[in-house]
Amino acid sequence: MTWVAHLVRTMDGRLGAQLDIAGEGSWEIPLNGVESFSVTVGKDQLRRIDPSWWSPYRASVAVSWRREDGSLVAWIAGPITGPPTETRSTATFECRGIGAVLERRVLTAQEPASQSTSAQTEMMAGRLAYRGMSLGTIGQEVVKRGMAKVGGTLPIAFGSPREQGSTLNERTYEGHNLANNGVWKRLTELSGVRNGPDIAFRPRWNAEGWLEWVMVHGTRAQPQIAQNWTMDLDTTSSLSPVASVDVTTDASKLASRVYWTGAGEGSTTMVRVAEDRSLLRDQMPILEAVGSTSDSANPDLIREHAIAALAASRDVVTQISMRVDGADQRCEIGRWRVGDAARVTLGDEWLTVPAGTSPKRIISAKGSWSSAMVDLEFQDDAIPTPDDYLDEEEIE
């Protein structure tokens, strides 16, 4: 069991040469973020490969975990983001997930038909309106629109169900709002509202042996990405695959009231407020926070951002860090993914977390190519219900 790296062509996922990993390198996968990793190879090998196969953004690197039976599980993949850093004998490529390409795509209702002023004015006057869809389904449409461009093809498949209905969500993206219409930015906003879906682009090898990224996301009923296996980690057992465990806490974002601003200037700026007065019990002083989505004039969306920010600010954030053996069947790389829930058992030595077994969400994973050891970060899930908080219309 080991790591295996390949070059692939970004636009269609065509498989290129296998790379001999010559240095340690590292990788990191955050929840709802863009992955990052580096791969070092010998320059002698690169000289035997057409440079177009390691050209920034034209080419990608896919690193897979080779299981005991020899099968490959694609683990992390994405474009090479710049020329390699060189020593006399090696070249190191910095890579990011496919989100690095989506960061460089802009939502427009149509492609400019020409370079004429009238064509560009028409493009700016257009708008994209998505109605009667779950947030995850809107995310799918955003990605599809981002690929519907000359040179926009990407091997992205969609692995989560579409949800449509008249009582679901709507989003409108104005053509003139180019600075805020980045595809990745809009996906991040969809995840960031109350009960917003987790979104991930997970690489896999298809039946033809080419690479594709599968967009998966939560649903209206379950914002977390569906999983078919649950990891069980017992930190109290001497036979556990857990090598180390640490607990950290952060109270810097505690708040019982959040002000969220939207579009507008001066006294016309849109503001929505969310608060939880139950947090003021037992002589707890009020703590306030301010956030902004300056490009939105949608009052419901601004309110959702305020409520989501308040939900994330209600409690002290407790984070559990573990180092696990990713070659162990109980937590083998590829059986779990960032975003999964795991059963975590802790002892009674911790002051800030209770002893016992409880579900925790994997919010990040990182490691290196020199070993199978993986550093995992866990947090509790915190999903508010629609009636949890007051907004400004209800505040006396």
What does each model-identified segment do?
Residues 98-247:
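Charged- and aromatic-enriched interaction segments used to assemble
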Residues 65-96, 344-379:
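Short beta-strand and beta-hairpin "edge-sheet" elements
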Residues 1-127:
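Beta-strand-rich assembly/attachment modules of structural machines
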Residues 27-47, 89-100, 190, 260, ...:
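Oligomerization/assembly interface segments of phage tail-like spikes and tubes
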Residues 56-60, 179, 339-341:
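Glycine-centered loop/turn motifs
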Residues 4-6, 217-366, 386, 390-396:
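Acidic, small/polar-enriched beta strand-loop surface segments
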Residues 73, 128-136, 176-184, 250-253, ...:
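Solvent-exposed, acidic/flexible segments
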Residues 8, 40-42, 64-66, 81, ...:
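A structural detector for beta-sheet-dominated domains
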